[in-house]
């Protein structure tokens, strides 16, 4: 059986049920991350922002800080913390460069890279300024 045409790209690769479940898990994780960051005083500038270098899960702002946020949802805390590989960090750095090129008014802000870890039955964990390029 072919997946529906409106299904996310991940669902069209391999097993449709697994891809769709992963897509939904990602949406729920990003929603939890948005709620956490809003409670901490951040304003969401963009969600699932697509750039030529790749997708940025969240772009948030608080004061003069502009954060590119990667959301990682895993079954265990250690797996979530280790899920962001150096290759993905470089991709996010390139995507952030595209973001700043597309929206030059953000260039005056202090750019940083954050990670939000989502683990079942635990509070989401926000790692502000998780790495420096």
Curated annotation (Swiss-Prot):
GO molecular function: nucleic acid binding
InterPro entries named in the record: Restrct_endonuc-II-like (IPR011335), tRNA_endonuc-like_dom_sf (IPR011856), UPF0102_YraN-like (IPR003509)
SS bond partners: none
Gene3D superfamilies per UniProt: 3.40.1350.10
Similarity annotation: Belongs to the UPF0102 family.
Name of the protein this chain belongs to: UPF0102 protein Plav_3586
Organism: Parvibaculum lavamentivorans (strain DS-1 / DSM 13023 / NCIMB 13966)
Lineage start: Bacteria, Pseudomonadati, Pseudomonadota, Alphaproteobacteria, Hyphomicrobiales
């Amino acid at each position: 059986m072919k997946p529906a045409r409106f299904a996310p790209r991940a669902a069209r690769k391999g097993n449709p049920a697994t891809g769709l479940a992963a897509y939904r898990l990602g949406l729920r994780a990003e929603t939890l991350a948005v709620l956490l960051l809003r409670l901490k005083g951040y304003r969401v500038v963009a969600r699932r922002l697509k750039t030529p270098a790749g997708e940025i899960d969240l772009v948030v702002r608080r004061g003069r800080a502009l954060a590119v946020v990667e959301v990682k949802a895993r079954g265990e805390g250690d797996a979530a913390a280790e899920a962001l590989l150096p290759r993905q960090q470089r991709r996010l750095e390139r995507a952030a460069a595209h973001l700043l090129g597309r929206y030059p008014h953000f260039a005056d802000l202090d750019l940083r890279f954050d990670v939000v870890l989502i683990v079942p039955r635990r509070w989401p964990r926000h790692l502000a300024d998780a790495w420096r390029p």
